[in-house]
Swiss-Prot record:
GO terms for cellular component: cytoplasm. This is Beta-ketoacyl-[acyl-carrier-protein] synthase III. Coiled coil: none annotated. SUPFAM superfamilies: Thiolase-like (SSF53901). Keywords: Acyltransferase, Cytoplasm, Fatty acid biosynthesis, Fatty acid metabolism, Lipid biosynthesis, Lipid metabolism, Multifunctional enzyme, Transferase. Gene3D superfamilies: 3.40.47.10. HAMAP family: FabH (MF_01815). Catalyzes the condensation reaction of fatty acid synthesis by the addition to an acyl acceptor of two carbons from malonyl-ACP. Catalyzes the first condensation reaction which initiates fatty acid synthesis and may therefore play a role in governing the total rate of fatty acid production. Possesses both acetoacetyl-ACP synthase and acetyl transacylase activities. Its substrate specificity determines the biosynthesis of branched-chain and/or straight-chain of fatty acids. Pathway: Lipid metabolism; fatty acid biosynthesis.
Amino acid sequence: MSNISVIGTGSYVPNNIITNDFLSTIVDTSDEWIRTRTGILERRISKEENTIYMAIESAKEAIKNANIEANDLDLIIVATLTPDNFMPSTACSVQKEIGAINALCFDISAACSGFIYGLEIACSMLKNSFRNKALIIGAENLSKIVDWKDRNTCVLFGDGAGAAILSKTKEEGILEFHSGSNGLKGEHLTCGVLKANNISNKNDRLENDNFIKMNGKEIFRFAVGAMSETICNIQEKTKWDLSEVKYIISHQANSRIIEYTAKKLNTSKDKFYMNLDKYGNTSAASIPIALDEMNKKGLLNKQDKIILVGFGGGLTFGGVAIVWSI
């Protein structure tokens, strides 16, 4: 059976930068408060860009980086919790714009774990079918579901998209996954939709609950436990010692979560790549944006061992061991 490798990456973030100082003018907060509690200095917020646009731009970059044509793609999966439409799917919209006429396309929703879930689904589909190449995108326009009056959440999130292209290869690539869900704790991180149809609504605007709401303490506890356990599980499957792993690329939610996870694993936080200071939490986009940034900076060499790991609403979690092949 063929191996599956990452052969290209891409990303897109809006040009519009929102600093901590700006947020201190609209909610009761400060740069010092945000920085010391989250590690975030700024985030990118879309002006004209929507989820589809950002997904398309990241896809174009990944295709170019992989040195393939769009019609070489057999599968497109977009992980997003902020689609522009219920239908057509974001993946189908990407297919149309890039000209990937041969691809099977669909979206998935697993919040911040979405990109990991997408990789696992794609690997399974490539290994068990005639398909050879897949485009996996994490794309989010979180600014449209953030309550900009809630200082506990509005300081955390940003917009952006990241992509990776997978291909069947002879060389070692994506090795082992570990993923799961805990719906029993789902109420700790929510974003509602309209609760009723509007056929009998007498008001101009339906009351809804369509902003991100989070129990920060519970999510922190879950995140540290889920990420450390996932990494340990992947170590067991691969027989890797953490000293062999060049980087751990985790979901970019909060620097404290990463620091506590490193401490629990008895390893240095420097093993964890972080760019959340520039982009904040971009949900499903955070891991592929970081991966593309590392690829562009030349931080990864062939045969480097890396682990991607994330957690998110649902609650969900997942990780994957990869031998880098670009």
